[in-house]
């Protein structure tokens, strides 16, 4: 499907990554393969390093950390945006939605449209399209689009095929109406025929008994 949106623009983009960094060479000992074969895979795939959370850091922690930074630095006001979209495949809980968790933890206004989208690889594009559609509403001036995942807990460190691909992190894009902005074109297609290749268990990141601590992302 082809999309075209006019009078929309990205006002800013922030990324949030954990400080904990691991290299493929450091993790090779976990893989049940001869080092020579793993090194060949590293060369073919271009594996180098990835960022992983420590402790019980969850998706909402990364989102809260990033938004709080924007507030504290004066780059975004708490009341500047009217919709919050969180795109994630690793929500804190089955319910409530992670977007509502973020809204509550930051004490954002109640008149804020909160929406979760369960998407992975196409998540930024899907979230962007949804943000553009929301901006059709007169009441919505800006949208905060958060793409975040903490997937390292869902993949075994011994899985040589998947673990090197996994990283934890978040991005926050601020999208707004802008008169005279060039047309933004997008194309999106879906194929769920091989869904079994991406199936994951239904575990959530944070149990009901766990209360999020004041945000300290490392």
Each language-model region and where it sits:
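Structured loop/turn residues at beta-strand edges in well-structured enzyme cores
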Residues: 3, 79, 138-141
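Phosphate/pyrophosphate-binding loops at sites that engage ATP/ADP/AMP, CoA/4′-phosphopantetheine
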Residues: 66-82
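Acidic, glycine-rich active-site loops and adjacent beta-strand->loop/helix elements
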Residues: 14-17, 87-93, 119-122, 147-153, ...
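Condensing-enzyme catalytic core mediating Claisen C-C bond formation in acyl metabolism
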Residues: 1-56, 159-218
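Flexible, glycine-rich active-site loops centered on histidine and acidic residues
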Residues: 136-170
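Short amphipathic alpha-helical face segments that pack within enzyme cores
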Residues: 61-66, 126-130, 165, 169
């Amino acid at each position: 499907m082809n999309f075209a949106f006019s009078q929309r623009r990205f006002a800013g983009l922030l990324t949030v990554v954990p400080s904990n960094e691991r290299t493929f060479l450091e993790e090779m000992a976990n893989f049940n393969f001869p080092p020579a074969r793993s090194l060949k895979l590293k060369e073919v795939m271009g594996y180098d390093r990835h960022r992983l959370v420590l402790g019980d850091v969850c998706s909402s922690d990364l989102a809260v950390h990033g938004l709080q930074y924007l507030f504290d630095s004066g780059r975004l006001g708490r009341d500047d945006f009217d919709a919050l979209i969180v795109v994630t495949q690793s929500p804190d809980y089955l319910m409530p939605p992670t977007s509502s968790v973020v809204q509550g933890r930051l004490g954002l206004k109640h008149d804020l449209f909160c929406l979760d989208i369960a998407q992975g690889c196409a998540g930024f594009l899907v979230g962007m399209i949804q943000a553009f559609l929301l901006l059709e509403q007169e009441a919505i001036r800006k949208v905060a689009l958060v793409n975040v995942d903490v997937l390292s807990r869902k993949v075994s460190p011994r899985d040589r095929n998947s673990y090197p691909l996994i990283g934890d992190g978040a991005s926050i894009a601020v999208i707004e109406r802008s008169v005279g902005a060039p047309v933004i074109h997008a194309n999106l297609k879906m194929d769920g025929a091989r869904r079994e290749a991406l199936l994951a268990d239904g575990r959530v990141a944070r149990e009901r008994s766990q209360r999020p601590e004041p945000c300290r992302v490392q």
